[in-house]
Amino acid sequence: MAANMYRVGDYVYFENSSSNPYLIRRIEELNKTANGNVEAKVVCFYRRRDISSSLIALADKHATLSVCYRAGPGADTGEEGEVEEEVENPEMVDLPEKLKHQLRHRELFLSRQLESLPATHIRGKCSVTLLNETESLKSYLEREDFFFYSLVYDPQQKTLLADKGEIRVGNRYQADITDLLKDGEEDGRDQSKLETKVWEAHNPLVDKQIDQFLVVARSVGTFARALDCSSSVRQPSLHMSAAAASRDITLFHAMDTLHKNIYDISKAISALVPQGGPVLCRDEMEEWSASEANLFEEALEKYGKDFTDIQQDFLPWKSLTSIIEYYYMWKTTDRYVQQKRLKAAEAESKLKQVYIPNYNKPNPNQISVNSVKASVVNGTGTPGQSPGAGRACESCYTTQSYQWYSWGPPNMQCRLCASCWTYWKKYGGLKMPTRLDGERPGPNRNNMSPHGIPARSSGSPKFAMKTRQAFYLHTTKLTRIARRLCREILRPWHAARHPYMPINSAAIKAECTARLPEASQSPLVLKQVVRKPLEAVLRYLETHPRPPKPDPVKSSSSVLSSLTPAKSAPVINNGSPTILGKRSYEQHNGVDGLANHGQTRHMGPSRNLLLNGKSYPTKVRLIRGGSLPPVKRRRMNWIDAPDDVFYMATEETRKIRKLLSSSETKRAARRPYKPIALRQSQALPLRPPPPAPVNDEPIVIED
């Protein structure tokens, strides 16, 4: 019952989205609307993930400690050798990376922003406290639902400010304390230079005479306000003018004038009414206009007694001293007393607490086991496992959980276990640091285990945006041994041809462990390599002479710039057309493909430039309807990566491939965006390979 009772001042979780983390808010008011619902007026707290990276770097810089150390000959006296440097918190350095990662999830940023949210969106209580340097950082991790903050975030101005004052430590900021005087020792300092007397207690006047002089000073102040036009506007009645003249600034000025005139009342009265007119003393209550007073009350309602923020956001033309002085005078006015009584009456009529039952509705991100398609991949699990059990949790990498939740973009098909989902909703992050953060070289998104072997995704963030994600297969030593010892059980060729057939990796591992002691005693049988005789090698070299070195190739930009849309020939697509309007490889590179209707095009003699399968003729003009788009003069962007394609080689491409050396073929495969310079030469007709010699006698070559 007490856990579901929420009061003003509680820190609570609010849920605004089923997939996003909870919002952390502090309840300021509980109001009941006209339709009977309860709304909570709350103060916003922001997480590190909610603010920009530049402000995060500024916050991390603020978290460093300034340590002063002394070195050199003046270390004892402190006269020289004092150096100040910024170092990281030593306690933060000793923490492991996992705890550092989780500690960042506990840091919040306070804001002055208020918003109203439905009370039914509350999902639980939490605790938020100001960062205390005397407490251990681990203490924040040991307590559940515990957060801390040290900076104030302004979502409108996008700035960070310190929430408390700082005390600077060091000889430059501390007062010099003199030595303690001994008993009977006199102070040699001149006290007249250290103190200023403003009133003489043993003066010749009695208290009655001083009171009469103060009455005269109030009368002079009232008369001065009657003569001043601006004061007449601000104080329209005689009663208000007399009240303004009776404030402390008039009395202090009268007593100061009496002290300066050596307590001679006649001279003091003459000083209050000089030749130009009576002296007018006004304080901050009279200096401020009505509009400025309204701005101050509005700022005080929003920021409280944070006079620095009041000055910056509402009254930048006023000094901080003037604002503070006006505040303490404003508290003595009748307006403040009336507002205080009105707020107390409103607080009595408002709700003090509200009961919110537990939220038991199912989350839309829950993964239903019955709705998962029952198709598995090699290594996803043994027969009898639930579908999709091979995909591990993105946070803790477990494969067993009573409930799974979808997490991240839908195309990534990532999921979290029940405990990690709760951690994600409360703390706004994963338990383990990700590889994208640069904190560990562990698995990344879409961690799958084909054939029961751990797979590690690529750490580059660009792969996270692709529909099909590349992965790196890291085989262990035991896996490589199992491929040889348990070949009849594993059947690697069959598994490669049927990647959707499940493989019982546990049984293979057990069988490999049983066969391993026997296999270590028998030597490994290596496959014998049959070498060709020397005569066959000589005949092959005679038949296939070394091709001449090609001429230097022009740069890709110059080659592409010389082509015009009318001279650009499309590529014949011999594969099946894409479905659902998917773009082909040629469309990604700015070249449209023609449909192949059973026609065969032959390579012309002037077609001497190939861009990895795309021919660019210089003289042949293709007759077709419409115009071709120009070729893009840039490399293919990784975002525009094509879908999987099927390349069917023709007789023309086979002939062209035979004209290229192996180094040119490999170079073209490594740089598919580079054009291929093909030297036009008549290819020699291929002769059948010579038969192997009958005799095994060596061949002797005489000079």
UniProtKB/Swiss-Prot annotation:
Crosslink site: Glycyl lysine isopeptide (Lys-Gly) (interchain with G-Cter in ubiquitin): 182, 614
Domain of life: Eukaryota
Span of the annotated motif SH3-binding: 545-552, 684-693
A Pfam match: GATA
Modified residues (Phosphothreonine): 564, 578
Listed Low complexity bias regions: 553-565
Stretches for region Disordered: 437-460, 542-583, 661-703
Name under which the protein is recorded: Metastasis-associated protein MTA1
Lineage of producing organism: Eukaryota, Metazoa, Chordata, Craniata, Vertebrata
